[in-house]
């Protein structure tokens, strides 16, 4: 695994860089930022940060959500936010087809191996949390993400229909 990035929990001091990260997705025509715990839908960074923080604990998690750890992937050389990734510790009925993990990479930083590195690092977080496996979904036409999942040990489990498109669920066993 490369050692170019580190995962860090969102913080207020990251607001400006986080908003620039989000804006780059929007300018690129992307309305959904996977792995962002609805950062793409929030008006206020502070409210989103409060929600993300609450969702890290079973005592404070939103009643419609599951305990989730959300991270920015930050490049070590310049502290630029490269991506976002989240880890859902359990799956409810809504999430059973979406999986334990979602991630996104900044449009200008794609095809540089960051997604593989991010997923590899979140697998270590999952293992440290006592998880034995994670499920992760990928749309059929997302060949790049499929490679990331497979290179991190993903094993095909099943296919399903999601909002008019076919997606696959992969399982990654944590050793």
Task: Label the model's feature ranges.
Residues 136-146:
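Conserved beta-strand-loop-alpha-helix junction that forms the acyl-donor binding cleft
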Residues 103-105, 111-124, 128, 147-151:
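Conserved acetyl-CoA-binding loop-helix of GNAT-fold acetyltransferases
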Residues 1-100, 165-175:
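GNAT-family acyltransferases
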Residues 79, 113, 130, 142:
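Conserved G/P- and acidic residue-centered "switch" motifs that form tight phosphate/ATP-binding loops
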Residues 74, 91, 100-111, 139:
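A short, internal acetyl-CoA/4′-phosphopantetheine-binding micro-motif in the GNAT/acyltransferase core
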Residues 126-137:
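Conserved GNAT acetyl-CoA-binding A-motif
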Residues 137, 155-169:
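Conserved catalytic-core motifs of GNAT/GCN5-like acyltransferases
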